[in-house]
Amino acid sequence: MISKPVDLPVDVVGAYLALRGEHEALQAKHAIAVAEAANAQAMLSDNEALIVALELKIEKLRRELRGQRSERTARLLDQLELQLEELVAAATEDEVAAQAASARTSSVRSFTRKRPVRKPWPDDIERERVVIEPPTTCTCCGGSRLSKLGEDVTETLEEIPRRFKVIETVREKFTCRDCEAISQTPAPFHATPRGFIGPNLLATILFDKFGMHSPLNRQSARFKCEGIDLSTSTLADQVGYATAALMPVFDLIEAHVFAAERLHGDDTTIPIQARDKCTTGRIWTYVCDDRPFGGTAPPAAIYYASSDRRGEHPQKHLAGYGGILQSDCYNGFEPIAVAATKAVPITFAFCHAHARRKFFELADIQKNARDRKRRGKPISPIALEAVKRYDELFEIERQINGLSAEERLAVRQEKSKPLFDDMHEWLTKERAMLSRSSEVIEPIDYMLKRWEGFALFLKDGRVCLTNNAAERALRSVALGRRNWTFAGSQRGADRAAVMLTVITTCRLNDIDPKAWLADVLARIADHPVTRLYELLPWEWKRASAATVMLAA
């Protein structure tokens, strides 16, 4: 480095060139360091996947030798298979990152994972030969005297509604009679690097795993029953590539969601496999859906995964958001509402379905009759009255669903406000007369302490009475827990969040997720970065409809 005045060139140009050369040298060193770190991470992820794969083999051999058929052993094998699935996908993601980092240098060789040799396709599988139109002139000199030299064949496994075929993409080679140069059409893009699985089949694998909650080991078993040998690690490899490929779309959906003026937010539990035990993680979702008040913005949902429910997670998610947040009364949201820390503060609108549910649990006659702990206890008349009052409010909401925000607000001011004001007066009066041991104190305090947030629907017609939009978005996670039991790792939960984002957003826009995935995975590799917005589900739907109209 140039550190002494005597080392500096006399002329300004020389000094500039020296500084520029030093800057470029530092950039090169930084790129090398980043590439080496990425390679090290890729090697570490590969070794972790290898260790779990060997543990799985050992456990299977031990089971065969000792004849163990216990439920515990079967569960252990399932856990190892799911953990291996997540580690292989993580190793593939790290390999992609290492390749990208190494491409920026000329001295660091990218780490490449060792993969098992792919087994040949069955002899009786259907094959379709697709010949790319060859060049008519020499790509070197422009001559037209071409003669066929040979051909390269790329085999891609594709799905045709549970019927499989191998597409042989032929690229014929031609040699020029004039200059002896060889001409050949460039190889086509694959949905994933080095991928031998077509976009339609890849879309099915992704949708079955994240949309229908079928783990990859079950999918592998199903493929084997149909005569196709695709191991769990092979499928996980493709899932890792596909998730990385879809990240730009995830980022665009994220930007769209947090640009909304009003959001629904909620979370649910998700068991995450750790080294020694399962931890209780969380899946968070934020949904923008303006259809209840006639809004024209496309609906969308974004998901995140975390290892716990600490408030730092939603605070990080919503750090750049300003507007209305409809949620439950989780106190982890509270710090983000401080106006001094945000240009546009967050205003909370609490869910009345949560509040009503607390009263309903004390007024549910059938449930109380089944509950041994409450046997003999009378139904709370206050809770029953609160449920009846809420039912009147919800009936008004059903009548104004889909109207404009202004129309909704006008109806609420006329019909809902008198009911809600009277409810506040009644709850305050009843609360003052209750003893500390009364069970109904909890739901009353739940509302009275947060009354401003519960009353926001009377001031803004955009606000919904419930947070059902977010709860519906998390319903698939609750259903999935019954099938896959737990996420194989934290990174596996993160991948699930990415795929849930695109699949749920497709569903919110009445789009077949498999059709969208198949088309986007086939196009995204060579789609211009400046036009990535065209792949957003609602833009894709608009373009598809226009294409159908032109064809008609």
Swiss-Prot record:
A Pfam match is DDE_Tnp_IS66_C
Sorted alphabetically, the keyword list is: Plasmid
Classification via InterPro entries: IS66_C (IPR039552), Transposase-related (IPR052344), Transposase_IS66_central (IPR004291), Transposase_TnpC_homeodom (IPR024463), Znf_dom_IS66 (IPR024474)
> Using the chain's own numbering, where are the disulfide bonds?
none
Q: From the record, give the transmembrane residue ranges.
A: none
Record's family? Belongs to the transposase 25 family.
Cite the NCBIfam families for this sequence: transpos_IS66
Write down what this protein is called. Uncharacterized protein y4hP
